Amino acid sequence: MDKKFIRNFSIIAHIDHGKSTLSDRIIEFTNTLSKREMTNQILDSMDIERERGITIKLNAVQIKYHAKDKHEYLIHLIDTPGHVDFTYEVSRSLAACEGAILVVDAAQGIEAQTLSNVYLALENNLEIVPTINKIDLPSADPNRVKKEIEDVIGLDTADVPLISAKTGLNIQDVLEAIIKHVPPPLDAKDDAKLQALIFDSFYDSYKGVVCLVRVKQGTIKVGDKIRMMANNKDYIVSELGIRTPKIVNKTELVAGEVGWVAAAIKTVKDINVGDTITHTNNPADKPLPGYKKILPMVYCGLYPIDTSQYDDLKEAMAKISLSDAALTYEYETSQALGFGIRCGFLGLLHMDVIRERIAREFNIELILTAPSVIYKIELTNNQEISIDSPAKMPEPTSIKLIKEPFVKLAIITPDNYVGAIMELCQSRRGIYDDLEVIDGTRRKLIYKMPLAEIMYSFFDSLKSITKGYATMDYELIGYQAEKLVKIDIMLNGNKVDALSIIAHRDFAYGKSKIICERLKEVIPKHQFEIPIQASIGSKIIARETIKAVRKDVIAKCYGGDVSRKKKLLEQQKEGKKRLKAIGNVDVPQDAFVKVLSEN
């Protein structure tokens, strides 16, 4: 096929602006799937994606479209997630395209993640085609949104498609805009040395690891001996093809095409997403510039509530990590919770999705320890170490200073909530940076803020005080030294490692008090008094006491001498002393679940 009839594009938007619905309508309009085969969110392959109405894994399909100019075009559509946690999925799909459709909600207008995805597309030199969706809503105001797109992003909206992905209104306008504005891969040559960009991979129990690739140069065929340029490993192509979104086998993929390649690869760890595939016997001179590797931002320990399921949890993590390149994990143990796994996630939604997948797909209920970020610690001997867990914090005497990650936080909000948002940001140690006017009623607030503060229910608080109207986006900007301390929680004088947290010194007392009070509520009474203490080093900063349960030892004495009663009470007193010295505090698992989930 002539390269001028190929188009590769992706759909980008803020979460919930209608990307997946637009993908459905495009697939339906071009008769790529029959009516019987269509389901809502056809590209969202996981149940959890359909239920939450979000896209987590990117997906790529090939579509044939007969345009108004009487030519047939081969269009590759790559659907991407919109949530800030899954930006790495977006960056990968954009590297495989020449253009992007920017979907903007006709009622809500430009949101925080609309902007961050636009900047990603511009970094990849993509042609951006703005599209205004949901024009069938009573609150839709396409003219206001057009002006926003022109003023804030600087794109021309003279012939912007006005569509309703839900009803299928004007879907052909979007396809015509793609043909008109997205450039074809004219520099792609079928006879050049093979260069294919791996932009995703997933595990198939029959084929092994399947790579989703964009063939930039050359041709790849079944039986070819191929090499991964990052690790120099060689494989033989066993199968390849395209997705429509059904898997369709082919004998070859040519330059400009997007498809999948299977080559009996055992684990996803053997594949670097962003790597280049080339031929072993006639390799390309240099690899394609891959997408940037994004490191985990949030760390958390996962422990099975039923400790006998630890081996099942290890197997579950191995299987999930086969299809999730951003998930990192290592094994760890806790005195309180037993054996577990410490995982690195991209954010709290990513963490929640993994927890839910483990519960659903493998039937393992988990306790999650308090989420933590990576802290950099400068020691008194001038060495610098990084820690992702309070348990790894060195002794206070050996610490010179502690640095924590800061993010640039952008919040877009109706102007009547600006005051409440500023109060929220200041209470979370935010540093005011800028306030921009988006239109007559909306403002964009910029703050510098510690990442750790955003992780603890910041998004929920933001939605609550703005009645759900505000949107946010953040990016890591570096590390900054702060007055941070490790807070240990002790039960009956013994440290409970699973409950330790790192907090700012100014907020340490408040956080400690809350944890102690929660523990007092959930730990059952014992036959001896239990002190619950929070300490920084050797200094106790908060305390609650669980009173002993009273056992009536003199109930059996009817009348008689008072000295008999005194003797029994003295014996009980001695027994309680011994229990307090050697007795273990029995903390039920649901107490950990309750305290850690609310932490």
Curated annotation (Swiss-Prot):
Chief location: membrane
Gene Ontology MF: a single term: GTPase activity
Keyword Nucleotide-binding (UniProt): yes
Entry superkingdom: Bacteria
Residues reported in the UniProt entry to bind GTP: 16-21, 133-136
Statement: the UniProt record of this protein carries the keyword Transit peptide: no
Name of the protein: Elongation factor 4
UniProt lineage: Bacteria, Bacillati, Mycoplasmatota, Mycoplasmoidales, Mycoplasmoidaceae
Gene that specifies this protein: lepA
